[in-house]
């Protein structure tokens, strides 16, 4: 049995650019890609915290250290500069591997400052 699991997550990054006329994709600072284990050209799902939009595209690398999150092409209609996003990638694996799997999660605040990294999403308390 194959399971689809969270592989990497950029939590609450801020959109710095939205370019409707750029060829598709989402440009992400190379440091951020590495923090979440997301590869260039990997499929990603994006969840817009500010407007509730959910959409899929692929990651491309932005300049290392630039703190850029640029939503491009048709996806630019789903996010505005300043919106907070959750960007996720997923991986498929066997049930046995999934039981041992830990995602790479990177948490951000302010102007895309990396606050911390984790290998799990915290348990939600009542």
From Swiss-Prot:
Substrate binds at residues 57, 73-75. Its cofactor is pyruvate. Its EC number is 4.1.1.11. The active site is at residues 25, 58. This is Aspartate 1-decarboxylase. It is an enzyme of class 4 (lyase). The modification Pyruvic acid (Ser) is found at residue 25. InterPro entries: Asp_de-COase-like_dom_sf (IPR009010), Asp_decarbox (IPR003190). Binds 1 pyruvoyl group covalently per subunit. Belongs to the PanD family. HAMAP family: PanD (MF_00446). It is found in: Cytoplasm. Heterooctamer of four alpha and four beta subunits.
């Amino acid at each position: 049995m194959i399971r689809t699991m969270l592989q990497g997550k950029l939590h609450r990054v801020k959109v710095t650019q939205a370019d409707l006329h750029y060829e598709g994709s989402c440009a992400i600072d190379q440091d951020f890609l590495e923090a979440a284990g997301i590869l260039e050209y990997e499929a990603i799902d994006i969840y817009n915290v500010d407007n509730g939009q959910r959409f899929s595209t692929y990651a491309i690398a932005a300049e290392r250290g630039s703190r850029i999150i640029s939503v491009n092409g048709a996806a630019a209609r789903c996010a505005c500069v300043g919106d907070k996003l959750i960007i996720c990638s997923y991986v498929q694996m066997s049930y046995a591997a999934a039981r041992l799997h830990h995602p790479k999660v990177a948490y951000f605040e302010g102007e895309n400052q990396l606050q911390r990294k984790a290998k799990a999403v915290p348990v939600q308390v009542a």
